[in-house]
């Protein structure tokens, strides 16, 4: 979930809700009632707001052109609310060139210049270490990732969830990279595990690595570990592939059950 204060800062808005809240979905009513709903599926809470800047013909003309053949609904599952697709649906195939960032970009941004570091090999992996501050970066060509570890004994785990998010965002901002297509995806363990993914046409991309575009872990003793995929979406290219038909959420859940996968093994399901 994301604090509404981040929404206010990102979009320059002020949500007058009476008290701070967190959310992970925003739903806009398309019946021109000018109602919006911030949904927190973790806490089963909905905050209703009035939208004051959408009452223009252009907005509703655009809304009328949105696809209506992909229905979604919220339902309770495993003690929490989950977004589900009640019917099978089709998604188009999008094709993009994939660029790969130079791992040394991360080394320079997070550790400093190479002449300050020791460089060693661990099999196929390259390890850059700054012994002065207990930080290192491991480049893994097999997974096409770099992993930054900060074990400075002065580090402390922030006590509040919002401050853990602040720490993660500050870490990402050090890179000074173009992350326009990268979005917050999920947090677990009270913000000690935070994942960001690249999004295309509103859907997350899963190919980048085992843990998304960016995955940050904060340990109880303050150690920080962040893994970055070197792969990034480039320019779009034409695709002649047919649309892919995806099953309903209920069908997916049944297939997982039949395959022996326990419901406790996953938190939610989303297409991408």
Spans of model-derived segments:
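Preferential activation on post-signal-peptide N-terminal prodomains/segments
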Residues: 1-160
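Exposed beta-strand-loop-beta-strand "reactive/processing" segments of non-cytosolic proteins
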Residues: 2-5, 9, 13-17, 107-141, ...
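Generic low-polarity alpha-helical segments
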Residues: 27, 36-38, 168, 216, ...
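Surface-exposed beta-strand edges and their flanking turn/coil or helix-capping segments
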Residues: 52-53, 143, 209, 239-243
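Charge-rich, low-complexity terminal tails
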Residues: 143-157, 225-240
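Segments that shape or occlude catalytic/ligand-binding pockets
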Residues: 167-206, 231-272
